[in-house]
Amino acid sequence: MKSKLKLHGFNNLTKTLSFNIYDICYAETPQDQQAYVEYINQEYNAERLTQILTEVVEIIGANILNIASQNYEPQGASVTILISEEPVTPTESQIEESPGPLPEIILAHLDKSHITVHTYPEIHPDAGIATFRVDIDVSTCGVISPLKALNFLIHQFDSDIVTVDYRVRGFTRDVEGNKHFIDHEINSIQNYLSEDTRDAYQMTDVNVYQENLFHTKMLLKNFELDNYLFGDATSNLSSEQRAQVTERVKHEMLEIFYARNMPS
C-alpha cells in the first residue's frame, strides 16, 4: 500500500466535478408538454434537490455549513450548499458572550467547499421533444474527493445523456517544499463508475492529463420507446408514429451527446 504524502500545512488542491445530466421525453400535445414541465417542477423541486445534495455531502464525508435553495417561475430550481471537511461543532469561544475577533486576525476558510444544482426544463413546441437538464457542481478543497458522488448522482436522475468534467487546480506542498498538483492517481472518470453503470452507457473520453482535466460523455445504450413517452403518447401512437417518434428522440439524443446539430 502506498504511504500517505506528508503535507506542509493544509491541502490546497481544489477538485471540481461537474455534471450535465439530460432526460429526454416525447410529449405530443401542448397540454402534455405543459404537464411534463409541471411534473418536472414537482419531482425535482428545491426541496427534493436539497435532499439529494444532502446525501451527496454524507457520501463524500463532508459537513454542511449553509443551504440556500430557490424554486423559480415558471420553471426550474436551484440549490447551493456550502460544506466543510471539519465537523461543524461550535467552540466555547464561539458561543460565549465576548467580543468577536479583530479583522486582522480573521483567517480565511481554506477548507470550505460547495455543491450546487440547477434545473432547466425545455420543450420544442413543434417537434414535441422535451428535455430536462440538471447541472451539478461538486467542488471540494482538501482531501475530500467529489468522485465518490459519481454513481449516486447518475442514478438519482433519469440520466439518458451525461457529460462529466473533473479537474484539479492549485497545488499543495509536502514537508520538503515540493509542489504537488494532484494528490491521487486517475486516468479516466470511467474508473470511478460501477460496473452496471459502465455496461449501461456508451462512453467517450477526452482527457488532458498534463492539465489534470478529465472529460467523459455517456449515452444510454438501451432504448425502449415507452420509457420516453409522456401523456397521451403512451397509448395513442400508431406503429408508424412510434417509428417516427423513435427516430426523432434518438436524433435528439445524438445531437446532445455530440454537442452539435446533425442532419435529419
UniProtKB/Swiss-Prot annotation:
Active site: S113, H118, C141
InterPro entries, per database record: AdoMetDC_fam_prok, S-AdoMet_deCO2ase_bac, S-AdoMet_deCO2ase_core
Pfam family, any one: AdoMet_dc
First-level EC class: lyase
Modified residues (Pyruvic acid (Ser)): S113
Pathway stated in the Swiss-Prot or TrEMBL entry: Amine and polyamine biosynthesis; S-adenosylmethioninamine biosynthesis; S-adenosylmethioninamine from S-adenosyl-L-methionine: step 1/1
The record's account of how the chain is modified after translation: Is synthesized initially as an inactive proenzyme. Formation of the active enzyme involves a self-maturation process in which the active site pyruvoyl group is generated from an internal serine residue via an autocatalytic post-translational modification. Two non-identical subunits are generated from the proenzyme in this reaction, and the pyruvate is formed at the N-terminus of the alpha chain, which is derived from the carboxyl end of the proenzyme.
Record-marked site positions (Cleavage (non-hydrolytic)): K112, S113
Note on cofactor: Binds 1 pyruvoyl group covalently per subunit.
E.C. code: 4.1.1.50
Sorted UniProt keywords: Autocatalytic cleavage, Decarboxylase, Lyase, Polyamine biosynthesis, Pyruvate, S-adenosyl-L-methionine, Schiff base, Spermidine biosynthesis, Zymogen
A GO BP entry: spermidine biosynthetic process
Reaction equation(s) it catalyzes: S-adenosyl-L-methionine + H(+) = S-adenosyl 3-(methylsulfanyl)propylamine + CO2
Cellular component, GO annotation: cytosol
An annotated Gene Ontology molecular function: adenosylmethionine decarboxylase activity
Cofactors required: pyruvate
Subunit structure: Heterooctamer of four alpha and four beta chains arranged as a tetramer of alpha/beta heterodimers.
Role of this protein: Catalyzes the decarboxylation of S-adenosylmethionine to S-adenosylmethioninamine (dcAdoMet), the propylamine donor required for the synthesis of the polyamines spermine and spermidine from the diamine putrescine.
Family: Belongs to the prokaryotic AdoMetDC family. Type 2 subfamily.
PANTHER family for the chain: S-ADENOSYLMETHIONINE DECARBOXYLASE PROENZYME
Protein name per Swiss-Prot or TrEMBL: S-adenosylmethionine decarboxylase proenzyme
Lineage of producing organism: Bacteria, Pseudomonadati, Pseudomonadota, Gammaproteobacteria, Pseudomonadales
